[in-house]
Amino acid sequence: MKVTVSHLDEMRFEAKTERGQSFVIDCPVISPIEYFLAGLVACTTSDLIAIPKKQGKTVTGLSVEGDVVRNETAPCKFNTLHLDYRFDSDADDTAALRWVMGSIETYCSTINTVRDTTKITYSVTHNGKLLRENEEIISGQGADVDFGEIDACCSN
């Protein structure tokens, strides 16, 4: 994977991917660290559409909120990350939890990039029912959760 960032003007930059796509980073409107967090949350959110779809299931009303606490002084790295998953589906609660864990433990590249240096917790509300609240991810190494190949945005 390769991305090239070029200065446009003032504090605006253009990011281009090796696949030819581009977007503008407009600091300080949205900071690079906010883009990073948004990318992390988008990665796991896309998994929560792709994994169920592969199993013939449908997810609706999906929302994932990422809340980070960072160092107050440089380097202002992530210390803690909490992910709050809320969605409805035509599957049972066990399947819904497996989808979340599949994303967290295996498929989401961005979560797995920060997991060794960041305390990560998560909550899951499925079909209006709170299934997990502030559960800590303790493995630190990912796990062999295999739903096969999925077509999610972080697969490339």
Residue positions per predicted region:
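Extended beta-strand/beta-hairpin segments
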Residues: 1-38, 49-156
